[in-house]
Amino acid sequence: MSNVPNELKYRDSHEWVRKEADGSYSVGITEHAQELLGDMVFVDLPEVGNHYRQGDDCAVAESVKAASDIYAPLSGEIIEVNSALASEPERVNSAPYGDGWLFRLKASDEGELATLLDATAYQTAIAE
């Protein structure tokens, strides 16, 4: 069974969200998603300054098996991307909740957090 940290929120499309000390939100893909995709070969990240609505496709993870769209879990502005992934996309595989984060955003509607899954609900969703 995949690791699903309790302190994170999730989308059923396998993105996770973590609130940072500065009020921004880090976003990545779940361990379950990276296991399904296999070894990452490239991650196409959004541009800093771009604005997305919740559910918009904003990035692409390319693995040896497939390319998969990554969706914005919250509406907001991209304020940082994990530039280390350009040369080390495998970080998404080795540390999906750590060094493999994809981008950070400034949420425009924190009320959208209520639409995300908690760890228990996400575990139930991926077990089906």
From Swiss-Prot:
Cofactor requirements of the protein: (R)-lipoate
Family annotation (Pfam families): GCV_H
Family matches, as CDD domains: GCS_H
One BP annotation, GO: glycine decarboxylation via glycine cleavage system
tRNA processing found in the keyword field: no
SUBUNIT field: The glycine cleavage system is composed of four proteins: P, T, L and H.
Family indicated by similarity: Belongs to the GcvH family.
Record HAMAP family: GcvH (MF_00272)
Protein name (database record): Glycine cleavage system H protein
Highest classification ranks of the organism: Bacteria, Pseudomonadati, Pseudomonadota, Gammaproteobacteria, Enterobacterales
